[in-house]
Design a protein with these regions (language model features):
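Long terminal segments
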Residues: 2-52, 58-60, 68-69, 75-141
Length: 141
């Protein structure tokens, strides 16, 4: 699940798509409300120790701190890994599906993130839905 956190980079593309504000960093929190990541306005994703773990460019490419491609997220929510293999979809309402089209969870408009058992696994208030979904549900790193 920690590797999924790094995948949050893909969510940065959604800021442009959704028109979210990027003036300051956006915070990802675990189920205990502890900060586990931040997304800077330039697309840099940092862990709770403030170390850079990933970056996403305007094309939706998700790259690690060494600039290696980890995956991509398209404007329609399609998520692909570094081999360009389809690994899932983030629907417009925040529903997340895996490569087999199985429901794995949802990111709600208030920022609450729940898994397929409807258990809260984290919070991403003011974070674009796609970014939160990538962070919590896709292992791109």
């Amino acid at each position: 699940m920690r590797n999924i956190v790094k995948g949050i980079l893909a969510l940065l593309l959604s800021i442009v798509v959704t028109g979210a504000q990027m003036g300051q960093s956006q915070t990802i929190r675990d189920k205990n409300n502890s900060t586990i990541a931040r997304i800077d306005s330039d697309g840099t994703v940092r862990n709770s120790s403030n170390s850079t773990i990933a970056h996403i460019n305007s094309n939706g490419d998700i790259r690690d701190s060494s600039n290696r491609l980890l995956g991509t997220v398209s404007s329609d929510g399609t998520v692909r890994n570094s081999n360009n293999s389809y690994i899932g979809k983030i629907e417009s309402d925040g529903t997340v599906r895996n490569r087999n089209n199985s429901y794995v969870g949802k990111v709600y408009q208030d920022g609450t993130v729940r898994n397929s058992n409807n258990s809260t696994i984290g919070y991403a208030k003011d974070v674009p839905v796609r970014y939160a979904a990538i962070y919590f549900f896709f292992d791109l790193i």
